[in-house]
């Protein structure tokens, strides 16, 4: 697996480029900004983007969708419950004092349990609301499609962080909802699952299950 993580924009959203070294097909997760740097990674690995996925519709995760779609022609994917947030980009931009990015059409609405395929790889869509109503995580099992990985992988967006969880004080957030998502859908994954959050360092499900302070009490 080709996997490069690029922190983009002034909020340093972790954009992931995940490619199949054999077929050169790839998906790009959360291209929030700095599309020219994402393009450099794609060019260096000679990757063709099959899908552009946003784990949720906050401005720091979707700011580069239009440019990357125009560059690659790949469809843009988002959960339907975050469409109101996506369509309120001018409001989001005003919150943090920046110009709103140009928007592109959402070409495919992500659904719970849906499988995304690129090359020999497969990822399962998990609807994990709480940070936003339409937040999703992508789970890549160890036997991911036609290949075997060293460990399962979880691309958690802003739902689960190393030692923390996503904030829930913004529009559509729910503290109870995010805990329900994490406990109900994420903590039951294999403990060796490597977690790639939307910001900050990687972690594992086992580490968060054992020591994340937000997950130690009911």
Predicted stretch roles:
Residues 29, 76-78, 156, 197:
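Hydrophobic residues in well-ordered beta-strands that form the structural core
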Residues 23, 33-121, 141-144, 152, ...:
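Active-site HxH/HxHxD metal-binding segment of metal-dependent hydrolases
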Residues 18, 55, 128:
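Conserved S/T- and glycine-rich ATP-binding loop of Class I adenylate-forming
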Residues 6-8, 105-107, 127-131:
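Short Gly/Pro-enriched turn/cap motifs at secondary-structure boundaries
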Residues 27-29, 51-53, 125-127:
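Short catalytic-loop micro-motif centered on adjacent basic/acidic residues
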Residues 1-45, 137-155:
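Conserved beta-strand hairpin/beta-sheet module of binuclear metal-dependent hydrolase folds
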Residues 91-95, 121-218:
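Metallo-beta-lactamase
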């Amino acid at each position: 697996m080709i996997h490069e993580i690029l922190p983009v924009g002034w909020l340093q959203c972790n954009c992931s480029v995940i490619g199949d070294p054999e077929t050169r097909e790839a998906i790009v997760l959360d291209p929030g900004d700095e599309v020219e740097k994402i393009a450099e990674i794609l060019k260096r690995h000679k990757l063709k983007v099959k899908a552009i996925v946003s784990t949720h519709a906050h401005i720091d995760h979707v700011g580069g969708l239009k440019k990357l779609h125009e560059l690659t022609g790949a469809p843009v994917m988002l959960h339907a419950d975050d469409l109101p947030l996506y369509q309120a980009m001018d409001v989001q931009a005003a919150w943090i004092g920046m110009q709103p990015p140009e928007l592109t059409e959402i070409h495919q609405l992500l659904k719970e349990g849906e499988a995304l395929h690129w090359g020999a790889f497969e990822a399962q869509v998990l609807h994990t609301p709480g940070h936003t109503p339409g937040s999703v995580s992508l789970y890549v099992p160890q036997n991911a499609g036609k290949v075997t990985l060293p460990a399962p992988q979880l691309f958690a967006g802003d739902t689960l962080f190393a030692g923390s969880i996503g904030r829930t004080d913004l529009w559509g957030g729910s503290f109870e909802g995010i805990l329900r998502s994490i406990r109900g859908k994420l903590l039951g994954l294999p403990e060796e699952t490597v977690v790639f959050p939307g910001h900050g360092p990687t972690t594992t499900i086992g580490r968060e299950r054992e020591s994340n302070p937000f997950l130690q009490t009911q």
